[in-house]
């Protein structure tokens, strides 16, 4: 009976902590039928509201009963250290050890490395005392994991087992040149090993969990971080190589290659095109081709070099990406970074450091050039921003978001308005998964949403910044361009024009007039137009739009339909 009382106390404390420390007696009594509230616990506290009230009043150090309200004392700072129920002198069970064992079991099953918030999601399956000692919220849960240094290792937003599976003596640690495996070479080595495992068991598919254990026995944790740190990530990695691996019912086997008429083998019919435009791979060696500028003069020089590359192209195409940040309570969007990629170099422009870079460096000229194709993903998100804050109107745009929607429309015969937008990482997985394999940027990092307002920008972060523009130019442009049917090319061009001309969308009484140019929230621009003596903001304010007239006062008796002072907005009929 004493054990049941303690369990009931823990249950109500946990419920009150989840509900901000205050609930009614009626609400607590409704928990009698909740999952985890046993019949012994109900008998211990009384099966009625009156019995529950007496039970709670019998523990004044924990609860305060005011009328029909129950308040948990000190719920803001309640934890395992100052909770009298969890002191070692009172309890007979080590709840902290039970919590550790619970999360070790979950990491062993789903890990051995997971995002902390993913591991926290399993907390709802634990007993009330385990939920109590491990913390109520993400911050407290992180502190609990960090305190258990003998069991867990916390790195950023991820946690892994300290005693995780380690490779055997046949572990692969070095490449052919004797250097540690990393990046693209680590992914290639993983593919070759996993392929060899399946070739040895060709007759029978291997369960994914067992397949991951084989992977852990051959590669150390450092290398696994570039490929997959848990079975779920390994599944995503295998899908990037769907020309080799076939997955069904969480079992993995090799793709059965078919012989074509010419005798060549064909395994997968989509996403198998190669990088045929001669563009450099995106790895550590590519850093010499990536140029980061944050001042006007270096930006002008970089634009000149980019124009030289463009003019030497037979078909003038660049990859374009504009990174934005959201600032303030109202969520106002500003440009933070601009990326332009050619086949030989990539330029990163820090648009947050200086407002005039986009206007005076020549960046605007590339965006508005009719002779240069700009390949961008989801241009609608930045077209309105460019037009109404900078008076920049992009022309000759190839929007991969529009291309994907048209292809889905053709395949499934759905209306374009019903098509959901696709993220860039999923666009890569569908049309060119090799771009992830050929990049040093891990799929884990690519699936996250970085903060593009972070400064300073490291070399590793530069690879993340240019990934989208590089992939758009090196692979997705040619792939999607070839997939668009001839009869849809006219529609595609019209849709690209539509998303890049937000003034058409603004012709609605429900939308506000366009805003004048606004300086960056990071650093106010002090550059002036010396020739005219005016501000650069005045020089580039959007002239085509007239300012809204100021409201005027009128005598009520003179306001009529004929004078135009009264307008009919909607007419309703019964």
From Swiss-Prot:
One of its GO terms (molecular function) is nucleic acid binding. The keyword Chaperone does not apply. SUPFAM superfamilies: Ribonuclease H-like. Residues 312-414 form the 3'-5' exonuclease domain. It is found in: Nucleus envelope. Residues 259-278 are annotated as: Disordered. Its main location: nucleus. GO terms for cellular component: microtubule associated complex; nuclear envelope; PET complex. Disruption phenotype: RNAi-mediated knockdown results in animals that are viable. However, animals display a small, but significant, defect in nuclear migrations in hyp7 hypodermal precursor cells where an average of 3%, and up to 21% in a single animal, of nuclei fail to migrate. GO terms for biological process: nuclear migration along microtubule; piRNA processing. It comes from the Eukaryota. Keywords: Nucleus. InterPro entries: 3'-5'_exonuclease_dom (IPR002562), piRNA_biogenesis_EXD1 (IPR052144), RNaseH-like_sf (IPR012337), RNaseH_sf (IPR036397), WH_Egal-1 (IPR056589). SMART domains: 35EXOc. PANTHER family: PIRNA BIOGENESIS PROTEIN EXD1 (PTHR46628:SF1). Component of a dynein-regulating complex composed of at least bicd-1, dlc-1 and egal-1. Part of a complex with bicd-1 and dlc-1, which is recruited to the nuclear envelope by unc-83, where in turn, it recruits dynein to the nuclear surface and regulates nuclear migration in hypodermal precursor cells. This is Egalitarian protein homolog.
